């Protein structure tokens, strides 16, 4: 048969049960000696129809285990059995192994269960030795506390017996007055507490309102921060654009200042008369037997010369008589104002040097326009004195500063040296006129 298993109701440790010869199962204890619990006559009648041979004890065949409650009572003198007044209790095993389930054990189990459920039997819970010691310590502490309270009550009672009736009444009146004062203080404190509760409620409401306002302000702050970031980005972009515009303005002002300091005629037209041939904008005007120049370059040089005189007349406000200058690159020409004739200032070399050709007429007409411009600028006192005089009818350029030599500008019955020298004299006069016009008209136009 397998022994029954019980657990301590406090620490849940298993309790070891010992089965003795001729007696019930007992629990091992260290503090007190366990006693056998007899079954009453009523129980004996319920459990079995015949008396037991051991003088009223439960036989070993019954499947009931007895436990002794640890109290101050000792074992009874009659055969080691415990009297009915002892605080012992029988514990019933509900559900044992199949080998112990006989009709007798089943009947006893049912009866014990009925007594437990009908409150006819007090059920105590088994404890191990350590838990029992702990329980006893707690009970000792409670007993000491109760003894202290009992001593205080006894001392108070003894003191009350020594007090006279008058002193008791005076003390009662004093205590009543103190009680009344304390009741008033309690009422005042109660009112103050109610006021504080009301104030607390108002403060709580204000706090909730402040928290709601704080949340709203935080949302607004976040929204404003996002808007600030957007505006800050736009500001940075605008600052970049402004910086770019300022840089462009600074560059434009510097360019404007440089352009104002730059003379347009000097920057556009460059005339050189130091060599054997006159040169304008790197185009040679004329040719020599030892220096052959193509007619395309000569025509381009004439185009630059026409453009120079045309520009000077425009800025001076001069309207030419008899001819109109038409700058057209290497195919520039003069248009007659009295007729429909056109006098070219370009040639491909096919014109006859023995006849009065249009190319020669065009060069004479150009000298006529140049003479008109010279007469216009001579009205200014600061006009330079030109080194070469123009004879329009003859088509001659006279050197008045040096030898007084006259050179014809025509190719008809003329040599290349004399023709080239006449062209060089003409460019020399234009160079001086260009320098005068650069100073004269630049001061007028500059703010």
UniProtKB/Swiss-Prot annotation:
Subcellular locations according to the entry: Cytoplasm
GO MF entry, a single one: protein-containing complex binding
Keywords: Autophagy, Coiled coil, Cytoplasm
A single cellular component GO annotation: cytoplasm
Region of interest called Required for homodimer formation, as start-end residue ranges on this chain: 186-256
Tissue: Expressed in brain, skeletal muscle, placenta, thymus and uterus. Expressed at a lower level in liver, testis, stomach, and 17-day-old embryos.
InterPro entries assigned to the protein according to its UniProt record, in alphabetical order: Atg6/Beclin (IPR007243), Atg6/Beclin_C_sf (IPR038274), Atg6/beclin_CC (IPR041691), Atg6_BARA (IPR040455)
Residue ranges that the Swiss-Prot or TrEMBL entry lists as coiled coil: 169-228
Main location: cytoplasm
Database matches in Gene3D superfamilies: 6.10.250.3110, Autophagy protein 6/Beclin 1 (1.10.418.40)
Family the UniProt entry places it in: Belongs to the beclin family.
Subunit structure and binding partners: Homodimer (via coiled-coil domain). Interacts (via coiled-coil domain) with ATG14 (via coiled-coil domain); this interaction is tighter than BECN2 self-association. Interacts with AMBRA1, UVRAG and PIK3C3/VPS34; these interactions are not disrupted by starvation. Does not interact with RUBCN. Interacts (via N-terminus) with GPRASP1/GASP1; the interaction is direct.
Described function: Involved in 2 distinct lysosomal degradation pathways: acts as a regulator of autophagy and as a regulator of G-protein coupled receptors turnover. Regulates degradation in lysosomes of a variety of G-protein coupled receptors via its interaction with GPRASP1/GASP1.
Name of this chain's protein: Beclin-2
